[in-house]
Amino acid sequence: MKAPLLSAVLALILGQAALPAAELATDFPKPPPPLELAPRMGRPFNDNAVFQQQMPIPVWGWTLAGAEVQVSLGQQQRTAKAGADGRFDVKFDALPADKLKSVDDAPVGRTLTVVTSFDGKRETKTFSSILIGEVWLCSGQSNMAVRYNSKGTNLDPKRPALRFLEDDWKVSAADTCGRCYGVSYVFGHKLQGELLVPVGLMNAAVAGTGIEGWWYVAPGDPPTPTKYQNYMPKIEPLVGHAMRGALWYQGEANVKQGKDYLPMLKKLIDGWRGAWKQGDFAFLIVQLSTIGESATDKPEGGDGRAAIRNAQMEALTAIPNTGMAVTIDIGEKREHPQNKYDVGLRLAAWALNKTYDKKDVVPSGPLYKAQMIEGGAIRVKFDHAQHGLMLAKKEGLAPPVPTPDAPMPWLSIQAKDGSWHWADGKIDGSDLIVSSKDVSEPVAVRYAYTIHPAGCNLYNKDGLPASPFSTCGY
């Protein structure tokens, strides 16, 4: 490989540049082995790290090829020998979580010590305050990467056992919490409060990125213009660090591919799960919210983000162990809605119910389940509406307030001849009955199936919004 091309590829690894398609003609190069004996650790390993409880704990790094390596974590010790590329790997036995007496508890943690030796020389690195708890990967594009803003949230930032990783692990405090992603911070804050164990958040998002750049890159895969751009610098350095699951807030860059997004999302999830070799770990998606101007003259909808929201909801049944936070009620005209607080809480609700088996937590708002034609009306049934449906209005970060006499916007019904008409909705316990004076033989229903359905007001009585839906697919 010519030197300029090698430099460009290495720049790509570091996230500094994207290669022109014409230059993507060779396999991804392996870095040369380290020239120093001092151990260089994988990205997840430094002071204040959080390791996943109840799973074997892999630790890896690089040193001189052939060097002897001793690694200890608390009372456990392992040995290894660096390979020809300088890499060494060890694995510790699974450990229980460090239980917290309260959310502001500050466990001492364990020490991770790495000793490398070669030709009579010896180097040691020590990392302190290593905690055992719950670890989540938080990825996507700019709406995931928006930093935490404490305004109006009333979240106490002093959480010594809540930590987040970018270049290194940081401990949650008043002067650090604003450097964490907003969605992931609220998610982790809520989890820790409910579980009373340490929580570690591995943040890895890049603004403006399509899903293709995040797909798993297998060793020896031929490069393409989309590969390596995000997966290699952001995800690959984390692969193997045991974790409970992943959060995914992305889709804005793929809205024109809404009808194809489900297989694209499946490729992402399957690739990451295969890389981690942990089975079907939890994968929680943020459904896209509103943006732009409302399109009130098209009852059939289908414009803008309608298809990709539909694909995100279909993932719940098409891909095992996936979840979704609905955000249709907290969007804005802008690309980046300010309210990341409710997004984090809704992701946490799904995780608490499904991943941590806390059945007293309602995981989601109403999700379309089935329709039944009843004369000139259609009865729509939902999952997660067992306590009933309601109409409500949400303002800012406050819980939605019931508005039982309000009209229900963004409902449309399809006639037997294929035409679409605006419709009325009537709540009947946990069902929604939809009809229109212009349609005597209805066949399908759509709700909020457009780019910016402002004022969506259908919730379950637990205060979580209904997802947009189409009973006839795309």
Labelled PLM ranges:
Residues S7-A17:
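Bacterial N-terminal signal peptides
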Residues A22-Y474:
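Cell-envelope and extracellular/periplasmic
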Residues M1-L5:
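Positively charged n-region of N-terminal signal peptides that target proteins for export
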